[in-house]
């Protein structure tokens, strides 16, 4: 069951418990019903154009689960220079327009902001 309407605040990441310094990563998991992948991907691609043009944007990747049984079949991973850049991009009227455009109500998501704690290669 999906809501009849997803408001801009439904796409907003909760505030940090502390002031973050350095790069941050948004991980946003989406529920996409089987057979709706193409519609989701097209909507995501239109929305991505807004974010890639914002100051502080580093990169954006969209992942699809290899199992059709996954609860969240698509995951968006976006890297930003700082939390301040991320918040600025997510605080505009254009952001609110982009994330409430028709179609998004079909794809509920669970966005959260992260920082790298340990990295190995």
Please provide the spans of the model-predicted regions.
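Short, well-ordered beta-strand segments in beta-rich or mixed alpha/beta enzyme
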Residues: 23-31, 61-92
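Short amphipathic alpha-helical segments
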Residues: 34-59, 94-103
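Residue-level signal for secondary-structure boundary sites
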Residues: 36-38, 84-86, 119
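Intrinsically disordered, low-complexity N-terminal regions enriched in serine/proline/glycine
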Residues: 39, 49, 71-73, 113
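Glycine-rich beta-strand-turn "strand-cap" elements at beta-sheet edges
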Residues: 1-24, 61-71, 98-121
């Amino acid at each position: 069951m999906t809501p009849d309407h997803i408001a801009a605040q439904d796409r907003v990441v909760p505030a940090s418990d502390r002031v973050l310094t350095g790069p941050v990563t948004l991980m946003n998991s989406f529920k996409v019903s089987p057979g709706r992948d193409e519609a989701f991907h097209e909507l995501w691609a239109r929305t991505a154009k807004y974010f890639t043009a914002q100051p502080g944007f580093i990169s954006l990747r969209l992942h699809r689960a290899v199992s059709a049984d996954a609860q969240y079949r698509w995951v968006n991973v976006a890297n930003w220079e700082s939390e301040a850049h991320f918040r600025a991009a997510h605080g505009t009227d254009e952001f609110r327009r982009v994330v409430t455009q028709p179609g998004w109500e079909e794809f509920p998501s669970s966005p959260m902001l992260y920082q790298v704690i340990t990295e190995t290669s």
